[in-house]
Amino acid sequence: MKFLHTVAQTATLLLSLGASVEGFNRARNDACKPHHPFRPLPASTPRTKTCHVRSHGDGTDDAAFVLSALRKCNNGGKVVFDADKEYTIGTALDMTFLRHVDLEILGRIQFTNDTDYWQAHAFRHGFQNATTFFQLGGTDVNVYGSGTLDGNGQVWYDLYAAEPLTLRPILLGVIGLHGGTIGPLKLRYSPQWYQLVANSTDVLFDGIDISGYSSSKNTAKNTDGWDTYRSSNIVIQNSVVNNGDDCVSFKPNSTDILVQNMHCNGSHGISVGSLGQYKGEIDIVKNILVYNISMYNASDMARIKVWPGVDSALSEDLQGGGGSGAVSNITYDRMYIENVDWAIEVTQCYGQKNQTLCNQYPSNLTISDVHIKNMWGTTSGKRDPNVGTIVCSSPDVCSDIYVTNVNVTSPSGTDDYICTNVDESLLDVNCSSG
């Protein structure tokens, strides 16, 4: 029954995504509903010329055709990937020169499975081993259509299982984009994160359909839907995410971000972090609104994850701890969950299994002014009798964390929370000793 309910909800939202392709709205601010961005998004200017991207049609690299069309129709044009064509990309594309241009994707764009080439030539971004097939950036750039970006992920899922230091490319890299709309669009089989939004401002993601699982015993790992990094005034809305990691993750120096009207399935929740990974770095995440979310078959719903003040290792390719910074003005509002392990998880011991070490070396990063409200549903029972955990490494680094009107129970009917080093008078939940 849970599965049927999930499928029905997803199908309804997908129908609305498909219907919106024809009605692309250049007034980005008007497209944001019910909440508006923290700052107005600039409108997109009209396009007056059209270029169609050629395709070899036989699996030969079409990257040169893409660049040729972009240069021809840059500054006021539309570049079309035709519906009856398949495009193969085997070369890393730097598309950060774009100005006032649309990319209408009607066909299928697939990246080659040449793992040696991509590990050597994909663009590196200096955070958590992040690399991208391409860099999309510039000013007033829109990417939309009924077509698909395909990351050819299976070869990467199998390779990563054998060699965990493999550098797996991110499917969609929005790097240095100032003013833009991404979506409607389908994203499939990303080798790692589906989207990285870095060094960008004033971007709307609207109507993104994400899905892609492994067909072998090697699962598709680290397939976050979105990761925002050093970016501000971003809107993510009206999207369906079927993946195996964070639905949305706010990485360091993400500010003024709105996430609304999302259906997430199989994920690790909508997460602040991880933060505090790198010594000497100051990570700030502030002014985040997460609204109207359905979360199914996930590890978490509302999640804040911070590294402790001691060296820690989550995995062979993800280690850190000891960084500093602050999390503030975070709101999660109106959430429904079903078969989710933790309704709420706040931790400052991310990547460290030894809680004693976390207590001895508390996080250098503060958490304050957090509001989690209006959540209902049922957990998976995996943490029974607990349904949530709100644990800070020291009372000195957490303040003003509020939880109100949260009606979540386990399948057995319990509703306990582990609460440590937080002001329990602000938590309208049943705090237990854990």
From Swiss-Prot:
Specific in hydrolyzing the terminal glycosidic bond of polygalacturonic acid and oligogalacturonates. It comes from Aspergillus terreus (strain NIH 2624 / FGSC A1156). Its EC number is 3.2.1.67. This is Probable exopolygalacturonase X. Residues 35-54 are annotated as: Disordered. It comes from the Eukaryota. GO terms for cellular component: extracellular region. GO terms for molecular function: galacturan 1,4-alpha-galacturonidase activity; polygalacturonase activity. It catalyses: [(1->4)-alpha-D-galacturonosyl](n) + H2O = alpha-D-galacturonate + [(1->4)-alpha-D-galacturonosyl](n-1). The active site is at 245 (proton donor), 268.
